[in-house]
Amino acid sequence: MALLQIAEPGQSAAPHQHRLAVGIDLGTTNSLVAAVRSGETATLPDEDGQHSLPSIVRYTQDTVEVGALAALSSAQDPKNTIVSVKRFMGRSLTDIQTGEQSFPYEFAESENGLPLFVTPQGLVNPVQVSAEILRPLIARAEKTLGGELQGVVITVPAYFDDAQRQGTKDAAALLGVKVLRLLNEPTAAAIAYGLDSKQEGVIAIFDLGGGTFDISVLRLNRGVFEVLATGGDSALGGDDFDHLLQEHMQQVWQLGDIDVQLRRQLLIEARRVKEALTDANETEARIILADGSELKQVVTKRDFDSLISPLVKKTIASCRRTLRDAGVTAEEVLETVMVGGSTRVPLVREQVEAFFGKPPLTSIDPDRVVAIGAAIQADILVGNKPESDLLLLDVIPLSLGIETMGGLVEKVVSRNTTIPVARAQEFTTFKDGQTAMAFHVVQGERELVADCRSLARFTLKGIPPLAAGAAHIRVTFQVDADGLLSVTAMEKSTGVQSSIQVKPSFGLSDTEIATMLKDSMKYAKDDISRRMLAEQQVEAARVLESLHAALAKDGDLLNEDERGQIDATMANVAQLATGDDAEAIKQAIERLDEQTQDFAARRMDNSIRVAFKGQSIDNI
């Protein structure tokens, strides 16, 4: 007799069957894949024993080379060898072309303004290039683990916006891979150390990779990882150290203008010199020119430190700002976790130790810690650890809100709110008989829409034609675990609703976030004054419109003298509303309110008389 195996919905019918899932650190410079096997978490090496895969893709006429093979050709064929593609994810072609850094690639522009790489195999976008990096990692994992993966957790920088996160998901989708979750890189590091060390308290995650810098302050308590605040710079990393060293070598050798091939050769040598100076006080830089001549120079640790010191100071300044956002001091931080290969640079470790007052944690390989944390999370999400009560709470970097009358911003979800999150707020109509309402979703900390970032617009139609203020529209903001935002507006009496998922076309850099936060503090007093003025102007418009309608209907309840006084006061309110004195507008509205109270009472009495006309007491 056949037996039916019964399981809870969403759980495996074979509770002891180990499901295959991995964590992937899709890095700017290098990428890794890790898995939990026999209770141990480790990164998976390739056939040559290499754990990290260079995030480099080269397109030839017939093949696509990825990793070390592509890196070998990067100096000879820089135009078709795409390096650090993560920096292009979610950015517009205009952003790239107007940036400070030049690239050897030939670009084309897509219909939505995003960059396309011109290659021997045609046009490819950053999502497709990212998929080529994921492909060998997935193949490596399936070969090592002996089966098809049931899901992956991919890490992204904490400041990746919706477009960049969606692009990462799309890269996996091109390979038919199920993304269990996108995980912020600092949070992944916290998982790796939190589960291993069982720490409780406040920790800082200092993540300096090849192309991005993230600083996150987290509170760890009984398996709960709560991100208190995040900061950083999406255009600062080890690649920038390499470029500074490359320029230094170029100046010492007096090379002047150089072609892209020699520039790439210099960059490769600069990276080697940087790595050598991790353990040595000096090293020799050497390159061979096209004519066969050899150039040499000694580069000391002091030279290197002098070059990169301004960038390292920028990371410390970000740490200081983020601690302030989190409401904690450096002394309250129990441990500082170092993430990313660039944290191996001695000056970085020295500055971090000096700022936080204690040596940073480096017990887990900083190159592998993110992938290890992602693997632990993947193992939980795929159902191998149903007993785990691990909870992840990330935060949104900038407040989300709705535009209201007068160009004001009504914040619905505040900055640094933990995600996933859902927040709802009720709005109403401004005019009598209004049957539609336009919604403008914005992002930022300022009081006026003009000073915030526009995310999306949508319209709710089918609102019952009621008096102004009578309809109730509930607007719900939902931010999921991947940081993607959905906004829904619903009219409560009819249930009619409209919604939109916000996926900005263009990326929002950490520099822009920092600027928006600085501006919100710099202009706080002025913004409050402007908001108060706009609020009084909107209130004046509402009162005047309502009163005009009342006078048109029941103006005969007033004598000529009373009507004249009200008209004069209304004219005064209208005139003041065009000015910039919020208090004067407020006082004029209050005088108008006092002046029309008797008129309002007469209207009420008249309405009652009309309603009860012809009715007997028994009927009432």
UniProtKB/Swiss-Prot annotation:
Keywords: ATP-binding, Chaperone, Nucleotide-binding. SUPFAM superfamilies: Actin-like ATPase domain (SSF53067), Heat shock protein 70kD (HSP70), C-terminal subdomain (SSF100934), Heat shock protein 70kD (HSP70), peptide-binding domain (SSF100920). Pfam families: HSP70 (PF00012). It comes from Shewanella sp. (strain W3-18-1). This is Chaperone protein HscA homolog. Belongs to the heat shock protein 70 family. Coiled coil: none annotated. Chaperone involved in the maturation of iron-sulfur cluster-containing proteins. Has a low intrinsic ATPase activity which is markedly stimulated by HscB. GO terms for biological process: iron-sulfur cluster assembly. The keyword ATP-binding applies. One of its GO terms (molecular function) is ATP binding.
